[in-house]
Structures are given as C-alpha cells and as structure tokens.
Amino acid sequence: MDMTNAQRLILSNQYYLMSQMDPTNAEKYKRQQLIVERGYELQIRELDKDFGCITETECREIIDFMEMYHAMQESYNMLSEECQAKVDARRLQFLGFDIATEAQQVNYVRFLTSSEGLYPQFDKADHHFNSQMPMLDKYRRMLTTWRNCPRQYHLCSTELAQIFNA
C-alpha cells in the first residue's frame, strides 16, 4: 500500500482516535498507528489484507451457488418421505467457503446473509459459513450439474445425488 506522508498522518490519527473510542481494542489500534507512523512496509501490507475486491462475475457466481442450495433445499421439501429417505439431508446445508484460502468469498456470503438478509434459511451454525476446506471447485462442479437438470427447482432424489457427487 503506497501512501504519502499526509495520508500516513491521517491514517495514524484515525488509529489514535479508534484507540480512544474503543478501549477493548486499543492495543491493536496503537500497534497499527505505530506501523503507519514509522512506515514499516512489511507490516503495512497486513493492514490492507481486508481490503479485497470481488468482481461482479465472482459475486454472481457466489449467488448462483447459494441459489443452487436454495433450490436443492426446496426440492427436498417437496419430495415424498420415501424419496427424502434416499437423500442425505446434511448435504443440503450450505457450508460456505474456507476462510484460510477463500476469505473474500466467506465475507461476501456473510454480507449477503447478515447485512442483506438473503437466504435466512441457511444455517450459519458455529462456523458462520467457514467450511474449513476449499469449496470453490466443488461448488463449480455442482453448479454445472445443477444447470443441466431440466427442472432446477423440482429435483428428484437421483438428481440431488448427482449434484452432491459432482
């Protein structure tokens, strides 16, 4: 992150104000203030790690994943009890993404569910959409299979199994 001295001064003052306003996190803000004031470039890079960018295409893809899970859940609810017994209902839960390798995606899902109020039926449980394993490639394979289904919101147990196993 390249900053002029004026920008560093402004940011330093912001961290100072935050340390005064939020005593529980004061040490964190004082540390960040010191990093900015002294220009420690290695540590400055950690300050901008949360400033990510997800393209419109990536956002739409994540929404498509979530919509696919919504469709699978609704399809499951419309199945007879006999057909429901053939489906592992645990696999209908949208797990989210891996916070270690897919942090931007996790944060976007959290934004959609918390701030935007979308998909309230998704159980965030204790993990809050941190799957703790990379999921992007898996979701892409599942999405391809789901899109090939003729009735995407009226899936049978066989189609659900095909999507899960993609």
Curated annotation (Swiss-Prot):
Organism the protein comes from: Aliivibrio fischeri (strain ATCC 700601 / ES114)
InterPro entries membership: UPF0304_YfbU, YfbU_alpha-helical_sf, YfbU_helix-hairpin_sf
Membrane-spanning parts: none
NCBIfam families for this protein: PRK05445.1
SUPFAM superfamilies: YfbU-like (SSF116960)
Coiled coil: none
Higher taxonomy: Bacteria, Pseudomonadati, Pseudomonadota, Gammaproteobacteria, Vibrionales
Similarity comment: Belongs to the UPF0304 family.
Protein name (Swiss-Prot/TrEMBL): UPF0304 protein VF_1794
